[in-house]
């Protein structure tokens, strides 16, 4: 079966697409990889050393004045002046 001759522009586009794919695959191959067991150990280490106060049974409650999110929430509130609600409908 004779190979059909493609116009040069289409050949160039095919070559460019192939080169882009090749470069993408080279970048993916060069990316640092770790094994699943090392990733799990890293997650376990992170969760055992960083306190998560969303789980008070494990880490306890935050000390007063330690929660910087609460301070910013109090500063943002004076706009409406309503305690216990998020907005005021007029």
Curated annotation (Swiss-Prot):
Protein's UniProt name: Guanine nucleotide-binding protein subunit gamma
Lipidated residue numbers (S-palmitoyl cysteine): 86
InterPro entries: G-protein_gamma-like_dom (IPR015898), GGL_sf (IPR036284), Ste18_fungal (IPR041848)
Sites of Cysteine methyl ester modification: 87
Residues cleaved off as propeptide: 88-90
Gene Ontology BP, a term: G protein-coupled receptor signaling pathway
Mode of membrane association: Peripheral membrane protein
Matches recorded under Pfam families: G-gamma
Localisation per UniProt entry: Membrane
Keywords for this protein: Lipoprotein, Membrane, Methylation, Palmitate, Prenylation, Transducer
Lipoprotein among keywords: yes
Binding partners and assembly: G proteins are composed of 3 units, alpha, beta and gamma.
GO cellular component terms attached to this protein's record: heterotrimeric G-protein complex
Single Gene Ontology MF annotation: G-protein beta-subunit binding
Lipid addition sites, S-farnesyl cysteine: 87
UniProt family annotation: Belongs to the G protein gamma family.
